[in-house]
Amino acid sequence: LPKAAKKKGGTAMFLARVEGSVVATKKDEGLSGRKLLLVRPQLVDESDPARFRPGKNTIVAVDSVGAGEGELVLFTQGSSARLAPNMKSAPVDAVVVGIVDTVDALGQVIYDAKTDGQA
């Protein structure tokens, strides 16, 4: 993730697309009963700020909001992830904390869930 996103003292949230789910039958007790999602960060494209470009890596994140495959979501990482409800004692580094309805960048809607994708 960008170095600016790793500042101390603040809670950073990121956008990601849900690409699938992860099933682990043997796992830490703190993950028992939790849905795991495979998410790919989405970045505003520097060459065309009206579009997203996918990040290079995927991340396994605990789902706290009932997100589904293909949805654009908000996720948080690190100590901020453990601030999500019922995550304080769970061994998590990334948690999906919201499902995105719209994204506006530079005065232009670049994502609208109603049209299922980029505006």
Specify the residue positions occupied by each region the protein language model found:
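Short aromatic-glycine-enriched beta-strand elements
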Residues: 31-39
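Short, structured beta-strand/loop micro-motifs enriched in basic residues and often containing a Trp
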Residues: 51-59
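C-terminal structural segments of small proteins and small subunits
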Residues: 80-118
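Short, Lys/Arg-enriched N-terminal segments with co-localized hydrophobic residues
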Residues: 1-12
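Short, surface-exposed secondary-structure boundary micro-motifs
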Residues: 21, 42, 78-79
